[in-house]
Structures are given as structure tokens and as C-alpha cells.
Amino acid sequence: MTYILATGLILGVASATVPAATVDHATRIDHHSGPVDARYRGTVAVSHRQVGSVAPGGRASTLRCMWSANMVVDRHATAATGTTMTRNFVRNDIASGSRAGWCDTHRNSIAKEVAARMQDMNGHIVAVAQEDHDVLRAELDRAHDKTRNG
């Protein structure tokens, strides 16, 4: 009996896991040391927060599942000189919402909603790449100065 219960719990947990959505973007940035190829990979991470409480019979429950999606971005840039620059950062609250009830019962539907917004995610990764260009240029300037000055 314990074996059946444990197997059921494992299967229940396995079916609740949803693969993370990823989106990629590649661009070329001009720099005085030469062109830089930059690749950005955004992985969407959804967090859930249970709020409210269960009410006694005959009263309305205040249970809600508040969720938000963040994009974890990995940047890999390679300069013409062979220098490789990597950076990881997070863009918070690219999507959010709430559902009535327990978070565990809504994880799959929330994941589907986030997947339906993947076109918006492409816009977010392009915007993140644009914001990162100045940071990347500054990193390249520092690396170029170190190699030039010894």
C-alpha cells in the first residue's frame, strides 16, 4: 500500500513539472576593436505565491494563486579579437496574474498562459539585448584597455 501511495505521489509531482520556455536572440554590435557577435538566451521562470485562506463551509474562500514570470537572461558575446564576455541577469515581471484557488491546481494552466505569451517574450529578449549593449561596450572597453596597456 505504501508503494502505491509513493508511486502516485511521484507521478503527481512529475506531471506538475512543466519545461521552462526559452527564447533566443542574436545580434552583432559594432565596437572600435571590431564587430562583436552577441547571443542572448532567455529562460522564463514562473514563481507562484499562495495567498488567502480556506473558509468554513457556507462561506466564500479567499484563496488565490498569485504568479509572476521572470526572464533569466544569459549573454555570450565573442569579439573579433577572440575575447568572450558572458553575463547573467534577470528581467522581472514580464508577465503576471492571479487565479482563484490553490496554486498546485493551476500550475499547468499558468504554464500554458505563459507559453501563449511567447511572442511577447521575443519582444522582451530584444529589449533586454538593446539595454545590454552599453554594458557590453563598457566591458569590451575595459578589456581592450587592459590588453593595450599591459
What are these regions (language model features)?
Residues R99-G150:
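Compositionally biased, intrinsically disordered linkers/stalks adjacent to structured regions
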Residues T17-T83:
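N-terminal secretory signal peptides
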